Amino acid sequence: MPAVVQVHDLSTVFGKGAQAFSVHEHLNLTVARGELLSLVGGSGTGKTVLLRHILGLTQPTSGNITVLGRPASELGGDGASSRVGMLFQHGALFTAFNVLDNIAFALHELHTVPRALAHEIAMVKLCMVGLKPEHARRMPADLSGGMVKRVALARALVMDPPLLLLDEPTAGLDPNGSDAFCDLLRELHAMLGLTVVMVTHDLDTLYALSTKVAVLADKRVIVHAPPAEVARFDHPFIDHFFRGQRGLRALAPAPAAAPPAKEP
């Protein structure tokens, strides 16, 4: 299966001289078409930094990244949103724009279609993420956290990109909201044939969505495999993250519903 993302011999260093510190050293990663990959790792391992490199927002110190066969460094220009969609952790909606104009932003900026058609496309995406037409004129301040995530997801998908990047997509959602958002992502992944790279700390989200998991530790990807295989890999971080109490809770079967009480 052809690679959508190819990261080769990547190194990332912040600071200079005595203050310099490295986040990535000789990191390699291949993301195949159709994969739904979760990036996990401890604090400071550079998960979001790697996501920003893939998006082309920042440049590594050395090494190279290709996205859909082109250097990631080219993604910062016009038309990038037609190749990669990005859902930021807190949504990052434009507070001065209503929901519809937030979703249609890339279409307006690139002038690829008339404004009326841009709004029609945005309305289709609005409904695709489970929102209603009456939400189109709301302002971001009037939305719940779950609705903000859905609007941001619609905006990320407005140009029909084949690659979707997600930074902590269920952060800040209650359990029901998190489950509903995972269901939506799973449906869109299948329906649109997306390749997805997701940073998450949430094991429930990871197990609900991931076809593969890549673990960042020791400044590189130490394992890239299906979740069950990763959970068996011998490493202190994996032992704590996957086989600690949180990991065991995520894997535990849901308790059976109590039978209805009998009438006396």
Region annotations inferred by a language model:
Residues L55:
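Helix-to-loop junction immediately C-terminal to a conserved catalytic motif
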Residues P71-G85, E109, A116, V230-F233:
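ABC ATPase NBD coupling module
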Residues A116-E134:
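Conserved ABC ATPase "signature" region
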Residues M139-L143, M147:
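Conserved ABC ATPase signature
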Residues D160:
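Conserved catalytic motifs of ABC-family nucleotide-binding domains
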Residues L164-D167:
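Catalytic Walker B motif of ABC-type/P-loop ATPase nucleotide-binding domains
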